[in-house]
Amino acid sequence: MMTRREFLQTSAAMTAFAMASPGGASPLSPLGAEWFDRPMRWAQLNLSEDDVAKMDRAYWLDFFRRIHADALCLSAGGVVAFYPTKIKYQHRSKWLEGHEDFWTVMLEGCRKQDMVVLARTDPHATYDDVAEAHPDWISVGPDGKKRPHPDYPGMWLTCTLGPYNLDFMTEVTQEIVEMYDVDGIFANRWTGNGMCYCEHCRQDFRAAYSQDLPLERNPRNPVYRNYLKWEQARRFEIWEKWDGVIRKVRPNARYIANSGGGATSGLNMKKVGELAPTLFADRQCRERVMVPWANGKNGKEYRSTLGNKAIGGIFNVGIVSPYRWLNSTKSPAETRLWVQDGMANGLRPWFNMVSGQLHDKRGQKVIEDLYVWHYKNEKYFRNTSPVARIGIVYSQQTAEFYAGAADMHRLVEDPQLGFYQALIEARIPFEMVHELNLDAANLSRFKTLILPNIAALSDQQCQQLRDYVQKGGSLVATYETSLYDEQGNPRKDFALADLFGASFVSRANGKTALQNTYLYPEKSSPLYGSMLKGLEDADTIIGGTWQLNVKSHDEAGKQPLLRIPAVANLPMEKTFWTLDKTDAPEVFMNQIGAGRVVYFPWDIDRVYWEVMAYDHALLLLNAINWVNNEPHPLRVQGQGMFDATVWLQKDSMTVHLVNLTNPMAMRPQMHELIASPPQDVEVEIPKGKRVEKVHALMKTGAVQHTVNGSTLKFHVPSVLDYEVIAIDLV
């Protein structure tokens, strides 16, 4: 039997291919009045109220110079004004008295170093005097009671959908940009504190829909669906109002929202990508059980709608969550790999320091090391496009209208993570694709799309996928993909049944997961060799926990995996099998014109994420390789786990290898860096280009290589944490 590594290393001879830039993405903007693409290394000082008197300004300005930071985000207003505000009810820091204008000192110091400067605001909380004067500004729970701040007595959570944001914070925003020559306002925690039932929210929602606010978040409730639409519209109304106020005063300045993410994000990422001139992924560190590639995943998700706009990756050197050790320092190994995985996936580093007073200076060195190295190699991080032929689709409408908050992880995030993990282990480059970017222009660069239980799809989206397959694209889909419309309403059959080669009959489950299920590999199937590669000696394979009963459109015997009915798991004496197999296929493999489609009517992706079964990884990768039907643009052979990516720049391309081979990879912190075994790399050179030079950026020095046709081959003796191989092209 093949080992897993041997299987992953197996690939056919590579054919030449053209590398396209991301669909819908505009070229990188030139440097000039629009500053958005200029900064490569960000700093943020998330100030404490007493910092205006106690913070060492000279230290920080010198630190920014040493690390080549070219942008700063500095706390300005909202909860606390760090400048001499004249606005009633904006709480001025009591440490301002008797000191020079803190903001003027910091702004002038940064401008002397040619730094971009954003002013940070935070509208999520206010004080007793405001609550007494404007009780309608305070967030209200479904019980009708005003919400006190959970962490700080004497403060209150604000309603961020009403006049507090629309009027008061608009006034704060305008005052800041009138007083200071900033490049924009960065608003933190501006999207609220949960559903608000204040008089403004109740009146405004009723005016829009003639309904009362829903009391629970139930995606099946049409009133709650209306609330989601109303909330989205109000958020974007606030966004555009603040942006308009800023640009009226300073035409080159913009509003930058601290928002965004993947399928579980609360704001429509398509709209976010259209509005934002730049954005920052705020996933600052790992917590509990989180994979080290989660930072890079955030970068892919943001890029799916922002295209080539600059995206920063916010990180923290401390152990922030869940117990909020805000001024702490974690292991340098953990910080390095977290930031490096972001760099490898197109994120520009942004460190966030809570308080300008350093209570533990150990974190400064790792920031300096990362930033100085990044500065020295900056031209190889000014990317024009990623190189990937596979895209994982993520769906916010599936999360909101089908899964809801209670089932969001099981039905949405976990299936996606299963495919993501399998591709990481196989070192296959891929991108994320937003559900509203399924038009031909955006999909033209992909050979294969993965649909991990993308249950809620409109008729138009399904037609876009159908057109994509007819033009030679391929799909891998799972479980209830296309069984619901975009509003989460169930369909009688899959909208993509014609592509799946199967129709929905019923659910095999009740309300609980199945146990002790199995699959039978059907060796007589003509597709057995393609789906069971690496599993030739398997008599049975574990099955799913959530399964659908479906009816095949094809003759019996074609498909290579059949269902074995669930078997009792207790008492042990009753665990005998009643059937060795059934005629029910558990995978459907179809050739449709030049395209191919694989459909699994069960939760293979979700189960892989939870259980990490070796067999399921092979099935997922066999499905991807069969539909993709072309070698991957990057092949990396060797032991270990890497996040491997490829990028194009103006006159070069780069291969990024982030070494995730570590016993703490699935825990909150890595304690040490562990060098990888040797890796052999093959990468395809763009058509019309010739290799001039190949060199390593981390270990520094020329890399011996060979070129055979369009294929560049080289050997990497070892990777400690991160290696970037730069390939200069002519």
Model-derived features with residue positions:
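N-terminal export signals
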Residues: E6-A25
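N-terminal structural segment of carbohydrate-active enzymes
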Residues: S29-F82, Q113
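Glycine-rich, aromatic-flanked loop segments that form ligand/cofactor-binding clefts
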Residues: W42, D70-L74, F102-P148, R254
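Aromatic- and glycine-enriched glycan-recognition loops and surfaces
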Residues: E49-I67, H91-Q113, E237, D414, ...
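Short, acidic/polar
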Residues: D51-F64, L166-E175, T264-M269, P332-R336
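Aromatic-lined carbohydrate-binding/catalytic grooves of carbohydrate-active enzymes
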Residues: I67-E100, D128-W137, C201, N268-T278
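Active-site-adjacent "subsite" loops/lids of carbohydrate-active enzymes
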Residues: P123-Y180, R217-L228
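Carbohydrate-binding surfaces of carbohydrate-active enzymes
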Residues: R220, Y224-V730
